[in-house]
Amino acid sequence: ASHGSPKSWAIGSLGRFGNEYSGWFDLQLKQRVYNENGKRVDAVVMMDGNVGQQYSTGWFGDNAGGENYMQFSDMYVTTKGFLPFAPEADFWVGKHGAPKIEIQMLDWKTQRTDAAAGVGLENWKVGPGKIDIALVREDVDDYDRSLQNKQQINTNTIDLRYKDIPLWDKATLMVSGRYVTANESASEKDNQDNNGYYDWKDTWMFGTSLTQKFDKGGFNEFSFLVANNSIASNFGRYAGASPFTTFNGRYYGDHTGGTAVRLTSQGEAYIGDHFIVANAIVYSFGNDIYSYET
């Protein structure tokens, strides 16, 4: 016991209820810029962060406690009705990424693509389903083997999903793919070859998910994902096991083309008028992947 505020333990591994004693928040600001003749433009800003629950003051910025944070995670413009071939789709430009899909009880993601800037199209009706596609870029810190020195590398990601494919009553399928490559300079490659920096390896992830909704509310989602290199390594983490390219923004590890598979089942069911039963099961296995934990 701390004889004070509650303390978190094993956030992102044992589950969020009862272990996440923090004040994380998302705040979205949205302003319509244009709306005429079936065409619409909105400016969107998303802020997220944490407000500490230990002290009455909660100033943001550098502080000894290090518990109060805030960032602009999204800042983009989204439009509808401007593309003749996809008038119903959302076309966006700016700091944004494809939609995240969360394993709710664990605060892990089955789909997550971090982005510093990019362009994308969402909810484009093609055939029986809809297409989401995004091309985004992000800089990552590539470390040397001492984990003391780093260099900044630009990466580019293409994220493609075909979703909302109807199967049977209240059941839909999604098929997804993602590929991440680096745009490295000659000096960055030289540091990897001669100065002990970890070699960048392109990484990919493919998968599918099936979502079944229930008559009385609730749903269950089953997903199958396979990945290689650094994304596969993140499948093996016991905390924060989302499909990241890096480990907390740091790129390191000997990635040698190994692959990993992850199976998930999650959902919730309404029992009567007053109770909700939730579930989350994740199973991962791989071969020749780098372990961030050991």
List each model region and its residues.
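Short loop/turn motifs that connect adjacent beta-strands in outer-membrane beta-barrel proteins
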Residues: 30-43, 82-90, 124-132, 163-175, ...
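Aromatic- and glycine-enriched pocket-lining scaffold segments that form the walls
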Residues: 108-211
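Residues on the lipid-exposed face of transmembrane beta-strands in outer-membrane beta-barrel proteins
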Residues: 25-31, 74-79, 119-123, 160-164, ...
